């Protein structure tokens, strides 16, 4: 979808209110996660699996955060994120430029070995990235280690529901078994793993109906235009696979077989 939108966000988006395009929906999801993480009182935020760093820049501007660290194993995405931030600095007023220049740091590292001392941060966010972390419990253990007491972990990610064995996943997910780049973690597994590492789950929101279905409908309704944009970078069969995958996501979402969870947990 990035090729279609031309934006630097990498999430499905939260299609609430007047959001009628992917960029607005993606901004909505970042806003939702930022509020849930209570970033107004945050001192040090670690954005794990930060992509191109667009959410971090949004949170920096919204909350005037003192210290945001983008952690990503993909060095090319980090480099592009730094270039995006630098471009914003060049076009910003001096006060905003100072904020962006000094408050966002980029670190090339794995989510399974976070390069921070024990008990040194008060917020960790994984916005649609934790679905890729393997093993998931190692990331949760690392999050617990580096968080201060009462520090917050906020995760936004798609999950499977009631697909508790491989055969069920293969049968029900269909094409998504190949095209949905994810470990396809189950919702109950995610919850139980977080609780097992002495986190208290404080808030859980299931927003799948405002993620998968409106995204698929938007793509279907605007497919002709989006297809041309995508085919400027990829062969036509890639676009066809993308469209079929989005429609399949909408179908299994309506059946209650996948969800999108936004979860906040506090270190005990």
Each PLM stretch: what is its role?
Residues 24-43:
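Conserved alpha-helix/loop element of class I SAM-dependent methyltransferases that forms part
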Residues 44-113:
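Class I SAM-dependent methyltransferase SAM/SAH-binding core
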Residues 112-124:
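A short acidic, Gly/Pro-enriched loop at the edge of an enzyme's catalytic core
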Residues 137-152:
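A short glycine-rich, Lys/Arg-flanked "PGG" loop and its adjoining helix->strand segment in the class I
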Residues 155-157:
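Acidic carboxylate diad motif detector
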Residues 159-181:
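Short, glycine-/aromatic-enriched active-site segment of Class I SAM-dependent methyltransferases
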Residues 182-198:
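Short alpha-helix
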Residues 205-268:
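Conserved Class I S-adenosyl-L-methionine
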């Amino acid at each position: 979808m990035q090729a279609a939108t031309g934006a630097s966000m990498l999430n499905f988006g939260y299609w609430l209110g007047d959001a009628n395009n992917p960029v607005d929906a993606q901004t909505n999801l970042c806003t939702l996660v930022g509020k849930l993480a209570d970033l107004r009182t945050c001192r040090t935020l670690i954005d794990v699996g930060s992509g191109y760093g667009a959410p971090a820049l949004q949170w920096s501007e919204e909350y005037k955060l003192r210290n945001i660290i983008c952690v990503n194993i993909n060095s090319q995405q980090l480099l592009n994120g730094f270039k995006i931030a630098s471009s914003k600095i060049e076009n910003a007023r001096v006060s905003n430029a100072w904020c962006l220049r000094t408050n966002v740091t980029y670190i090339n590292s794995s989510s399974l070995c976070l390069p921070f001392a024990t008990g040194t941060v008060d917020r960790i966010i994984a916005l649609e990235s934790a679905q890729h972390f393997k093993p998931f419990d190692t990331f949760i253990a690392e999050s617990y280690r580096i968080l201060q007491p009462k520090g917050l972990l906020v995760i936004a990610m798609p999950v499977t529901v009631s697909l508790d064995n491989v055969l069920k996943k293969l049968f029900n997910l269909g094409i998504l078994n190949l095209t949905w780049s994810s470990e396809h973690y189950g919702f109950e597994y995610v919850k139980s793993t977080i609780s097992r590492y002495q986190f208290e789950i404080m808030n859980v929101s299931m927003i799948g109906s405002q993620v998968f279905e409106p995204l698929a409908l938007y793509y279907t309704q605007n497919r002709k235009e989006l297809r041309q944009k995508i085919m400027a970078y990829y062969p036509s069969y890639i676009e066809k696979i993308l469209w079929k995958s989005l429609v399949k996501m909408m179908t299994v979402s309506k059946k209650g077989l996948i969800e999108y969870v936004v979860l906040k947990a506090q270190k005990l």
